[in-house]
């Protein structure tokens, strides 16, 4: 499995939102110049201390105009909080603007109170995530959307092969593997109760094993780990 080096930011620099966005764009330009393969950004709604970038695809469109080679990814879009068709449309447009450099990472987690303004509770996020991901898949495949005349434009079947799923569990890794998606692992992985110093590899290697065992024959594994 080839290894690649990526750059990840939660946009936690001190300063205003405008300053944070400017600095993150500069960092990604530097990453491209230094030979990094990819750059990934986090999404957070409402909470400045978490990073304060609610619109990652808008930001990546800005960065795409300033870069040529580096792949640009979301790590993650908190999918339960989003309109899935708008995500599908915006990602389809952005992939064209980037000449196919977009990678799309999805997750279901987030600050529990952030779900409330979107009409959800944290407990409902798993079901909402599954429903939204299914609709995005359907749209990118070119399926009709509630009426024979409605199909996603621009079409984006290629993006289905660049979906990444963030998870802390073997169960989530199995679902990602069965679907042929990439697996995203985080340095923020929770430790089991009573084992606060357990190293990440002790927790995440079994998750990786579960993912690999679930991949369909002929599907190459894609594993991303932030450190």
Q: Which role fits each region the language model picked out?
A:
Residues 32-33, 60-69, 91-102, 177-180, ...:
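Acidic (Asp/Glu)-rich catalytic clusters
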Residues 189, 203-226:
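Glycine-rich, Lys/Arg-enriched anion-binding loops that position phosphate/diphosphate groups
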Residues 1-66, 70-71, 161:
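N-terminal beta1-alpha1-beta2 module of alpha/beta enzyme domains
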Residues 10-12, 44, 77-79, 107-111, ...:
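Active-site beta-loop-alpha junctions enriched in small/polar residues
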Residues 1-3, 83-189, 195-198, 202-209:
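Internal, glycine-rich beta/alpha segment that forms the wall or movable "lid"
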Residues 47-55, 80-85, 190-192:
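Acidic-and-aromatic substrate-binding clefts and catalytic sites of carbohydrate-active enzymes
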Residues 76-86, 141, 217-227:
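Electropositive, surface-exposed helix/loop patches at the edges of structured domains
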Residues 5-9, 39-41, 72-74, 102-106, ...:
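Hydrophobic faces of well-ordered beta-strands that scaffold small-molecule active sites
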């Amino acid at each position: 499995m080839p290894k690649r080096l990526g750059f990840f930011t939660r946009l936690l620099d001190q300063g205003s939102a405008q300053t944070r966005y400017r600095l993150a764009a500069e960092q990604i330009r530097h990453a491209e110049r230094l030979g990094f393969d990819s750059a990934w950004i986090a999404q957070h709604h409402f909470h400045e201390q978490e990073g304060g970038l609610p619109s990652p695809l808008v930001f990546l469109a800005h960065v795409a105009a300033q870069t040529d080679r580096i792949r640009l990814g979301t790590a993650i879009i908190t999918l339960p909080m989003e309109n899935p068709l708008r995500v599908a449309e915006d990602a389809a447009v952005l992939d064209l603007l980037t000449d196919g450099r977009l990678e799309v990472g999805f997750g279901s987690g987030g600050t529990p109170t952030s779900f409330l303004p979107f009409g959800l509770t944290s407990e409902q996020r798993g079901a909402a995530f599954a429903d939204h991901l299914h609709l995005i898949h359907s749209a990118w495949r070119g399926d009709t959307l509630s009426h024979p005349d409605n199909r996603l434009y621009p079409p984006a079947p290629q993006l289905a092969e660049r979906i990444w799923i963030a998870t802390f569990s073997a169960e989530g890794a199995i679902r990602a593997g069965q679907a042929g998606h990439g697996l995203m692992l985080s340095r923020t992985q929770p430790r089991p109760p009573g084992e606060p110093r357990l190293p990440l590899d002790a927790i995440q290697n079994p998750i990786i094993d579960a993912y690999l065992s679930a991949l369909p024959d002929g599907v190459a594994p894609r594993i991303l780990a932030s450190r």
